[in-house]
């Protein structure tokens, strides 16, 4: 069972940030990328835009299981906040792609000129470190219902 207080803090953090590190892999081939994202609180999903021909996208098409981080860049240890996540990612199409594109372009207007595809990263598990609540304080969330 997810702690509602943890969920509120995790959601707030994900809404406030906009860049994630995405790690994809297949067999012994692994690659990471930094991507802008939009958070969908209702689906506990992140929408991101990246071309299909990139190394990380090619890996995601082979193996949709990904992991990554979202972190602040605080110089003060007492203020460090960040998320480690794992999830499943898929290339969007049709109405779902258009809805995600509209939402993404509202957050990042420069993306309106891009035809790069949109992806949906369904979060499965999150561990958040929030030193503002006490050094090393961890918050957790995991998906309880199947996708």
Curated annotation (Swiss-Prot):
Record protein name field: UPF0306 protein YpsIP31758_3570
Spans through the membrane: none
Stated family: Belongs to the UPF0306 family.
SUPFAM superfamilies in UniProt: FMN-binding split barrel (SSF50475)
InterPro entries, sorted: Split_barrel_FMN-bd, UPF0306
Coiled coil start-end: none
């Amino acid at each position: 069972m997810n702690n509602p207080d943890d969920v509120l803090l995790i959601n707030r953090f994900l809404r406030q940030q906009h860049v994630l590190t995405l790690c994809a892999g297949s067999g012994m081939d692994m690659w990471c990328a930094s991507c802008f994202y939009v958070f969908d609180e209702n689906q506990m999903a992140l929408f991101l835009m990246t071309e299909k021909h990139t190394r990380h996208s090619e890996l995601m098409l082979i193996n949709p299981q990904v992991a990554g981080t979202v972190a602040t860049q605080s110089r003060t240890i007492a203020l460090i906040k960040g998320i480690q996540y794992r999830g499943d990612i898929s290339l969007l199409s049709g109405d779902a792609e258009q809805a995600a594109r509209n939402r993404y372009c509202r957050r990042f207007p420069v993306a309106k000129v891009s035809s790069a595809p949109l992806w949906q990263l369904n979060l499965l598990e999150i561990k958040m470190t929030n030193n503002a609540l006490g050094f090393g304080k961890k918050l957790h969330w995991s998906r309880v219902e199947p996708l």
